[in-house]
Curated annotation (Swiss-Prot):
CDD domains: URO-D
Classification via Gene3D superfamilies: 3.20.20.210
Compartments where located: Cytoplasm
Reaction(s) the record says it catalyses: uroporphyrinogen III + 4 H(+) = coproporphyrinogen III + 4 CO2
Keywords: Cytoplasm, Decarboxylase, Lyase, Porphyrin biosynthesis
Biological processes, Gene Ontology terms: protoporphyrinogen IX biosynthetic process
Pfam families in the record: URO-D
Family: Belongs to the uroporphyrinogen decarboxylase family.
Taxonomic lineage of the native organism: Bacteria, Pseudomonadati, Myxococcota, Myxococcia, Myxococcales
Enzyme class at the top of the EC tree: lyase
Organism annotation: Myxococcus xanthus (strain DK1622)
Pathway: Porphyrin-containing compound metabolism; protoporphyrin-IX biosynthesis; coproporphyrinogen-III from 5-aminolevulinate: step 4/4
Protein name per the record: Uroporphyrinogen decarboxylase
Matching PROSITE patterns: UROD_1 (PS00906), UROD_2 (PS00907)
Length: 348
């Protein structure tokens, strides 16, 4: 197996810098669109053969160092007993969670019974790849999932979830606790199915002040990370707009902290220290730069991150209009310049 990513997550030496891309299996790939044109998104997530097929597509086309299982962070939420509608315009909960009664109605599902198709997709992905690269399992963080559930979908202001947290903190903690009780076995199921590393996405964590994040989110993330690390796999935590939260993310005990593009890698390293690996952090829209400029951005990030304990990635998901050839150019540039970085020959 190409184990660069796993070695980097553990801050062990690698021959070059490993790279994968958030949302690397997605609408920017014509082969993905060919499959997606015949099946609804949620149905695709629940079809192990097709989910495995689209998981493998970017590994084949781009040469990335890992496959992240094709799924959605809201899959385990649906298994808790709430109606979920997923389409190209984003998620929608027609019956949002707003009261104690709503929270009490939510179950803590058996992961195999409620989401076993995710485990099966991981097994089929490993077989299709012949274990050539590791498979990344993932889940959303309790706050991000709760934000969707309470708001009823995406939000720009997060008024409803924040009001719940600030006006009825005991209810918010009850919801976060129930989500954590669901997510830990869900991720352990993915590890048992063959995921070699897992990522926890707190996509909307940057909506909270560091003070509120420490109070409402860190206790649950610490518990998740601790229980997952006990399985022996490395754990990545990532959120958008969280440059001022890095020390908090480090406190979770995660092996890797993902950075978005708003903070240079070397500055993130200073906050995190030498005992945590980093992931990131190219702006997804830099894939629209001319190739020479994109190449320069790759070099700069590699130089700032250093040769060990760095997984190259975007600062958030790859965007649908992205040219797949630009993504392939990026992967090849990371690998090429990663070697030069280790040889001391990385130019300007």
């Amino acid at each position: 197996m190409n184990d660069r990513l796993l070695r980097a997550a553990r801050r062990q030496p690698t021959d070059t810098t490993p790279v994968w891309l958030m949302r690397q299996a997605g609408r920017y790939l014509p082969e993905y669109r060919a499959i997606r044109g015949n099946i609804a998104f949620l149905d695709l997530c629940k079809h192990p053969d097709l989910a495995a097929e689209v998981t493998v597509q970017p590994v084949t086309r781009l040469g990335v160092d890992a496959a992240i299982i094709f799924s959605d962070i809201l899959i385990p939420v649906e298994a808790m007993g709430i109606t979920l509608e997923l389409g190209d315009k984003g998620p929608h909960f027609p019956d949002p969670v707003r009261s104690a009664a709503d929270i009490d109605k939510l179950g803590v599902p058996d992961p195999v019974e409620g989401t076993g198709f995710v485990a099966e997709a991981i097994r089929r992905t490993r077989k299709a790849l012949n274990d050539s690269v590791p498979v990344i399992g993932f889940a959303g963080a309790p706050f991000t999932l709760a934000a969707y559930m309470v708001e009823g979908g995406g939000s720009k202001s997060y008024i409803l979830i924040k009001r719940l947290m600030f006006e009825q903190p005991e209810l918010a903690h009850r919801l976060f606790g129930k989500l954590t009780d669901t997510l830990i076995p869900y991720l352990k199921m993915q590890v048992e199915a063959g995921a070699s590393i897992v990522q926890i996405f707190d996509s909307w964590g940057g909506a909270l002040s560091p003070w509120d994040y420490e109070r409402f989110c860190i206790p649950y993330l610490k518990r998740m990370v601790s229980e997952l690390k006990a399985t022996g796999v490395p754990v990545i935590v990532f959120g958008v707009g969280m440059s001022s939260h890095l020390s908090l993310l480090k406190s979770t005990g995660a092996d890797v902290v993902g950075l978005d593009w708003t903070l240079p890698m070397d500055e993130g390293r200073k906050v995190l220290g030498p005992d945590v690996a980093v992931q990131g952090n190219l702006d997804p829209l830099h894939l629209f730069l001319p190739r020479e400029e994109l190449d320069g951005r790759v070099k700069d990030i590699l130089r700032r991150a250093g040769p060990e304990g760095h997984i190259f990635n975007l600062g958030h998901g790859i965007l649908p209009p992205t040219d797949p050839d630009a993504a392939k150019f990026l992967v090849e540039a990371v690998h090429r310049h990663g070697v030069a970085l280790r040889q001391g020959t990385l130019g300007a």
